[in-house]
UniProtKB/Swiss-Prot annotation:
Keywords: Hydrolase. Belongs to the UPF0173 family. It comes from the Bacteria. NCBIfam families: PRK00685.1 (NF001911). PANTHER family: UPF0173 METAL-DEPENDENT HYDROLASE MJ1163, UPF0173 METAL-DEPENDENT HYDROLASE MJ1163-RELATED. One of its GO terms (molecular function) is hydrolase activity. This is UPF0173 metal-dependent hydrolase Oter_4201. HAMAP family: UPF0173 (MF_00457).
Length: 227
């Protein structure tokens, strides 16, 4: 698996037969604007409806003829605008020719921002477990720590992408606790330092995680690694 980080919670996962883009906050990403044309993908994953996770999903779908994977209500919103979608709900999943997607619960919100302080609920927030090429990756979306992370990790997770920014999601201490439940081969922090409220030192999180036996890689925006 080849993984590229764009900052915030946006990642591109390149598998042997497909390219998956998670929470595609590209053009307006505070870590550095990325042109959606420059990120070819086959599936676009949106964990929930907040603008920093929906990002450029519709534009990417149109540019690259990609399908959008999202919770049912959010997928219906995209479908009404002409996108092809795969609609799931937490606890459900789908097997595709290249592998399997399972949608996991998350503890957060999922409202579409309509402007003038108005919002529209778009169903539950979510995370995703992807299994392909003999490996697995968990993108937690935006979430608090919750005990059923132990169930998510029960069949083995190779790479876990976890929010650590606090304020709107779990912070570093709870993210370390999440690692005790998930037991991934490698953890990568996300959703931090993209606005003043969620400023944390990811290297302090990494040091504490390593101290308790959990390998961590802190990725820089624009960095690509093999996992």
């Amino acid at each position: 698996m080849r993984l590229t980080y764009f900052g915030h919670s946006a990642f591109l996962l390149e598998l042997a037969r497909t390219r998956l883009l998670f929470d595609p906050y590209l053009r307006e990403n505070p870590h550095g604007s990325v042109d959606p044309k420059s990120v070819p993908c086959d599936l676009v994953f949106c964990s929930h409806a907040h603008s920093d996770h929906v990002g450029d999903a519709l534009e990417l779908a149109r540019l690259h003829h990609a399908k959008i994977v999202a919770p049912y209500e959010l997928a219906e919103h995209f479908a009404a605008q002409g996108a092809e979608t795969i609609d799931l709900m937490p606890g459900g999943g789908v097997t595709l020719p290249w592998g399997r997607i399972d949608m996991t619960p998350a503890i957060h919100g999922s409202a579409l921002e309509l402007g003038d302080g108005k919002t529209l609920s778009m169903g539950p927030p979510s995370g995703f477990v992807v299994r392909a090429d003999g490996q697995s990756l968990y993108h937690a979306g935006d979430t608090a720590l919750f005990g059923d992370m132990r169930l998510i990790g029960r069949h083995g997770i190779d790479v876990a992408l976890l929010p650590i920014g606090d304020f709107y999601t779990m912070g570093p201490a709870d993210a370390v606790e999440a690692l005790h439940l998930l037991r991934p081969r490698l953890a990568i922090p996300m959703h931090f330092n993209s606005n003043p409220k969620i400023r944390v030192d990811p290297h302090r999180f990494a040091a504490e995680a390593r101290r308790t036996g959990h390998p961590v890689r802190v990725m820089s925006p624009g960095e690509t690694i093999e996992v």
